[in-house]
A protein has these predicted regions:
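GST-like domain detector, emphasizing the conserved glutathione-binding G-site
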Residues: 1-123
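Non-transmembrane alpha-helical segments in soluble domains
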Residues: 67, 71, 90-93, 133, ...
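Long hydrophobic alpha-helical segments typical of transmembrane helices together
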Residues: 175-205
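Active-site-flanking alpha-helical
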Residues: 71, 161-162, 197
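Short polybasic/polar patches that bind polyanions
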Residues: 20, 167, 189
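GST-like fold's C-terminal all-alpha helical module
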Residues: 96-185
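Aromatic-glycine hotspot motif
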Residues: 52, 64, 129-132, 137, ...
């Protein structure tokens, strides 16, 4: 099994963290989908990462599907098995994925020529991130993990999302959410996060 992804992609990183946490035998292959010689479009018609090759010539794509497949390998998912815990985990994942989407939308706007940038769009994405942080802080009940008493996909997705905010939209969100910041410091100290941190960036605590 092979996972194709970009080192800077938070979508691929979710899968990479999960692979390490579950000790899954899966080769990681770095492939920038923006490169002219990228092999990603031949594996995923949408041209995005991550792409998971589950058998020769058989590919899964889109991070929710890839993560769901990996999490359910060998019948030992990190996702809670009780209904309440499962849907709570899904809530956190939706919030984290939305934060990633907003952060990417903001950074893409900043890369446009200065005379073509839309400040109102940047402010809208920043407001989405701020509301998500406030919602996360209000929902977090304390403890080592977001849902229950063990690591779940909620921790992985939110951990990656908040660290992506640190990388692509660095600002002091921690002073307003000290409890969430403490949780994040603990999660991102795990081997899976340290080993998948994009080169050139330092973990913020």
């Amino acid at each position: 099994m092979k996972l194709y992804g970009s080192d800077f992609s938070p979508y691929a990183r979710k899968a990479r963290v999960l692979i390490i946490e579950k000790n899954i035998d899966c080769e990681y292959v770095a492939d920038d989908p923006w490169a002219a010689d990228s092999g990603i479009p031949a594996k995923n018609p949408l041209g995005k990462v991550p792409v998971l090759e589950i058998a020769p010539g058989k590919f899964l794509f889109e991070s929710p599907l890839v993560v769901h497949y990996l999490d359910n390998l060998e019948g030992k998912p990190l996702s809670p098995t009780d209904a309440a815990g499962y849907w709570q985990s899904q809530w956190w994942q939706a919030l984290g994925n939305g934060m990633i989407d907003a952060t990417i939308a903001r950074i893409l706007e900043t890369r446009r020529p200065a005379d073509k940038q839309m400040p109102e769009k940047m402010r809208r994405e920043e407001a989405r991130i701020a509301r998500a942080l406030s919602s996360a802080g209000g929902e977090y009940a304390g403890g080592e993990f977001l849902v229950g008493k063990k690591l779940s996909l909620a921790d992985i997705v939110m951990g990656v999302a908040l660290q992506y905010v640190d990388i692509r939209y660095p600002h002091d969100w921690r002073s307003g959410q000290p409890a969430l910041a403490k949780w994040h410091a603990g999660i991102t100290a795990r081997k899976s996060f340290l080993q998948t941190m994009p080169a050139g960036f330092t973990r913020v605590v």
